[in-house]
Amino acid sequence: MSDSDLRACLCVRGDGVLLMLSVVPNARRTEADGLHDGALRVRLAAPPIDGRANDALVAWLAKSLGVPKRDVDVLRGESSRRKQVAIAVSHDAAAAWLGGLLGGAR
């Protein structure tokens, strides 16, 4: 993952980070699937009905990053595949997590 890839989907915001996401609901399982148009693509097993996909996304991000769910907030795109999520975690920790996810991604 290049620095420009990292800058495109992850930036510092106050005491945390902003993460740009491209979400694909109704997948077989919840997992990261590389970068897509400057955002981390996440496949979600949940359907996009009654906020279930957003709830699954928040739970997956919180568990993956080791933060409470209350520290993950969907700021933009609640009803869209493109989302902007604020996470109360250090930029270094988020960048290391993202690098680990994308290490083998194309």
Regions found by a protein language model. Name each.
Residues M1-A59, K63-K69, D73-S79, Q84-R106:
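Contiguous, often N-terminal, cationic amphipathic patches that form binding interfaces
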